[in-house]
Amino acid sequence: FFIEVKSCSNKHLTCPEIPKVNINGPCACDEGWDEHGGKCYYFSTNKSSWTESRDECRAKGGDLVKIDNWCEQIFLRTRLNGKMENFEDMFWIGLTDAVEEGRWLWLDGSPLNTSLSFWADHEPDNWTHENPDGEHCVRLGEEEGEEPLKTCLTDGSTKH
């Protein structure tokens, strides 16, 4: 798996989102959501832009996922592996450099913990061929021909 930067307007699968969690008792997620580490995740296979994906997450009471630790990253890698039919299937995550080029922030404003990032070899590259402003959104997926258990994060915002 890797992280890749892409144009925010490109169509990709909606990212996992973090919604309702019962803090005072055992975690009980709504039907269709997966629980891990006290958080609930919804995996949508709708292909949409980063903004459309975020809107879908927020309508369900969550947001695009913020990866806080290695355990969460491994959980996401494992769950997403079962959702992807081919290497182009990637999921938007809540990481962007839209506020300041090259400074990667989660949607809550916290900076990317670089010890948790696994950029693809060529990323972030701020590719400007499709959009002169470059790329500002991040997607999580698997590189073509890579081992299924290998993980890396990529900044992505292209359409498919």
Residue ranges and their predicted role:
Residues F1-H160:
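Extracellular, disulfide-bonded carbohydrate-recognition/adhesion ectodomains
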